[in-house]
Amino acid sequence: MSHLVALAAALGPDATLISDSDITASYSRDHAPFAVSAPPFAVLVAKNAQEISKALIFANENKIPVVTRGAGSGLSGGANSDAQSLVISLEKMNQILDLDVANQIARVQAGVINIDLDTAAKEHGLAYLPDPASREWSTLGGNAA
């Protein structure tokens, strides 16, 4: 059984697993002009932590390299895959789960865009101050990475 078929079975029918190389190529690199990359064998567009957990267990058991991807806005090559890689995209995990105004704490998913958190914070007289040039489309998960 191929890794793709086995991974799809492990994730279940509701998972978004992409294997078309014309599409996976767009998930294969960040904006580093010098870093080597190749389209991964598959991209999981994760919707929740359970899908990520299942994918990581599968990858670990099968010695498959994993690249986690936010928006691909980085300039270091850190989000670049090779042909044996599984890319886990966090683009759909983009919810602001809680804004605790009193304690100035936000609980967010990794795919939240910088500007979206800043906009939500401004509604309460607060701000999300990291201001990368890519703030219009870079994610908090990428900031943390």
Segments from the language model and where they lie:
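N-terminal glycine-rich flavin-associated loop
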Residues: 7, 34-66, 84, 90-133, ...
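Short glycine- and acidic-residue-rich catalytic loops of nucleotidyl-transferase/cyclase enzymes
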Residues: 69
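Short, acidic (Asp/Glu-rich) active-site segment that either coordinates a divalent metal cofactor
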Residues: 76-79, 86-89
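N-terminal accessory segments
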Residues: 1-32, 61-64
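Conserved phosphate/anionic-ligand binding catalytic regions in large, soluble enzymes, centered on
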Residues: 79, 143-144
